[in-house]
Amino acid sequence: MKLFAIYLGGRAIKCNTELHDVVFSCGNKIEDTYKDLLDKWFGLPDRLHIDSWVELKYVDGFEVVLSNDKPISKNKLFFINLGGYDKNKFEELHESRFFVGKDDKNIKLRAKHSLLVGFDQVHTDDIYDVDDCIEIKEVSGLYVNLIKSNKKENLEFNNGYLPIPNQVIKSFKKSIL
């Protein structure tokens, strides 16, 4: 079983532009997460799609392992989403990254020194402690365990429009009626 971070896109009632959210889900392949993504999406199911996804296999010198056992390590997996502005653009810009650390204070400091360097008015938007804020237990009853690793492996981002198949959406909509 693999842990995925998924950047969702879609629409909600009364919105003028595409909306986004980042969620975490488990499966053997990304397609296994589709129903869970629909459960977690706040907007219109018919417009939900994946804009980016990544398997969280190695992060910050740690191997990410899903297990039935509660973690014994004090290290935690964090997702940081930092926002900032460029005076020449009409938008808030974001940069996101995954970190491992013992507490969010240290992680916030690391993020502020490595994300959106050189941008105006940088601020922290969302910080998630995956173990505490995202209930991994509810996605197949598995816990995130972090094992120190010497293996250096970059995350492989899968970027591009990936729609949730219509038959999955239809089945989901029937299940919630």
Segments from the language model and where they lie:
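A cross-kingdom feature marking solvent-exposed beta-strand/loop segments within repeated
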Residues: 11-25, 45, 90-98, 117
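A cross-kingdom feature marking charged/low-complexity
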Residues: 1-3, 7-8, 54-90, 117-118, ...
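A structural feature that tracks compact, well-ordered secondary-structure segments
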Residues: 8, 22-23, 27-28, 82-83, ...
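Short edge beta-strand segments in beta-sheet-rich domains
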Residues: 20, 94, 122-131
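The feature marks the first
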Residues: 1-35
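Conserved short beta-strand edge segments in small beta-sheet-based binding/regulatory domains
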Residues: 46-54, 120-128
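Generic "edge-of-domain/loop-turn" microfeature
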Residues: 13-15, 30-32, 60, 87, ...
